[in-house]
Regions:
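DNA target-recognition domains and sequence-specific DNA-contacting regions of bacterial/archaeal
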Residues: 32-174, 225
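Non-catalytic DNA-recognition/assembly elements of restriction-modification systems
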Residues: 1-49, 63, 67, 172, ...
Length: 226
């Protein structure tokens, strides 16, 4: 149910974006390189032959992969694999701030998510960092509609795109009035989606904790207080 609601909310935002910024021209918009507007960093993978840097303990540092971005929804808060804190420090893995837009650009190009909390990623993911957080909803939609085929030949797009190309990709900056209006509509929608995702994640975690205990008889369903 939450998935359907979130899809509907996101579709409303994408529809407004399409109407205002894709189907409607405005000569006052400025085009620049992405790295002229954002501080773009790239993730990292410690040496795989040294397993001490990797973990499957959710208490360790979240380390996002493209696979995680394929299942997370609009916001991402967890990963299937983690890094130890020592790995982040020793190998200088970039820590991504909360509420930062992520973009996959290797093998699977164009997956997008927004961080819910601080985390790290592997080297196939770019981080669009900015102090101007009101641009995030616009950036998310911009990347959703961006034609990644323009960044390499159709047959080799999965391998042709690299961090240099991502940093140099064109970014269309909306006018202040356009951004203020779009942010005013989109931000509450994104906040609702985030709240729904958190609630769903909490219910899923509760289910995963209780179900094995119920199945084993360790817990009695009639004595559970929710």
């Amino acid at each position: 149910m939450g998935y359907v609601i979130n899809n509907n909310l996101l579709e409303q935002v994408l529809t407004l974006y399409r109407n205002k910024f894709v189907d409607t021209a405005n000569n006052e918009r400025v085009i620049c390189r992405a790295d002229e507007y954002f501080d773009i960093s790239i993730g990292k993978t410690p040496p795989r032959k040294e397993p001490q840097w990797f973990s499957t303990n959710p208490q360790d540092v979240t380390w996002v992969s493209i696979s995680d971005m394929g299942t997370c929804g609009l916001y991402i808060s967890s990963s299937s694999e983690q890094l130890t804190k020592q790995a982040v420090e020793r190998h200088n893995v970039k820590v991504v701030p909360n509420n930062t837009v992520l973009l996959s650009f290797k093998l699977t190009v164009g997956r997008i998510a927004i961080t819910n909390g601080e985390m790290t990623t592997n080297e196939a993911i770019a981080h669009f960092k900015t102090d101007k957080k009101e641009i995030n909803e616009y950036l998310y939609c911009y990347l959703k509609y961006f034609n990644y085929q323009t960044m390499g030949s159709t047959s080799s797009i999965a391998t042709a795109v690299n961090s240099k190309i991502i940093k140099g990709m064109p970014f269309v900056v909306p006018t202040n009035d356009e951004l203020e209006e779009f942010h005013g509509f989109a931000a509450p929608m994104f906040a609702k989606i985030k709240a729904n995702q958190i609630e769903t994640d909490n219910l899923t975690a509760l289910r995963d904790t209780l179900l094995p205990k119920l199945m084993s008889g360790e817990l009695d369903a009639f004595n559970i207080e929710i």
